[in-house]
Amino acid sequence: MVLLAAKGLSLLDVNPGLVVWTLVTFLVVVLVLKKFAWDVILKALDERAETVQNDIKKASELRLEAEALLKDYEARLNSAKDEANAIVAEAKSDALKLKNKLLEETNGEVKAQKDQAVKEIELAKAKALGQLQAQIVEMTITVAAKVLEKQLKSEDYKAFIETELDKLGKLSA
């Protein structure tokens, strides 16, 4: 600008000759481009536009497919969670049933052992009472025989009874 201003030319001045030659040059360039390059340029632009449209379409299809896959994944995940919860609930139920069954079996065994112990105690008690009764009968017979053998005085009789009762107490203890 400084050089043009120094020569006396201004950028804002219109030179009619320069305008004509600029237009002629522009038209020649446009005609040459139209004849040799315009179809190639338009074809490249059309191909690029078509590629962009195809890419947009593919991206849209992929987005829809991804959304469908996401929904399917979420449905499967929820199904798996429900199934896992059902398995856990069933396992808890089975464990509770097994616990109750084992408790019933254990209680049955304990009751059977208790009943067996009670029977054994009753048998031992009956046997001990039978033996005690036999000893009492034997002692009574012995006492009666001794009493009949000799006539005791009442003091001797009391001492004899106390002695025999002491023997009986020692046997039952």
Swiss-Prot record:
The chain crosses the membrane at residues 12-32. It is found in: Cell inner membrane. Keywords: ATP synthesis, Cell inner membrane, Cell membrane, CF(0), Hydrogen ion transport, Ion transport, Membrane, Transmembrane, Transmembrane helix, Transport. F(1)F(0) ATP synthase produces ATP from ADP in the presence of a proton or sodium gradient. F-type ATPases consist of two structural domains, F(1) containing the extramembraneous catalytic core and F(0) containing the membrane proton channel, linked together by a central stalk and a peripheral stalk. During catalysis, ATP synthesis in the catalytic domain of F(1) is coupled via a rotary mechanism of the central stalk subunits to proton translocation. F-type ATPases have 2 components, F(1) - the catalytic core - and F(0) - the membrane proton channel. F(1) has five subunits: alpha(3), beta(3), gamma(1), delta(1), epsilon(1). F(0) has three main subunits: a(1), b(2) and c(10-14). The alpha and beta chains form an alternating ring which encloses part of the gamma chain. F(1) is attached to F(0) by a central stalk formed by the gamma and epsilon chains, while a peripheral stalk is formed by the delta and b chains. One of its GO terms (molecular function) is proton-transporting ATPase activity, rotational mechanism. Belongs to the ATPase B chain family. It comes from Leptospira interrogans serogroup Icterohaemorrhagiae serovar copenhageni (strain Fiocruz L1-130). The gene is atpF. GO terms for cellular component: plasma membrane; proton-transporting ATP synthase complex. InterPro entries: ATP_synth_b/b'su_bac/chlpt, ATP_synth_F0_bsu_bac, ATP_synthase_B_chain. This is ATP synthase subunit b.
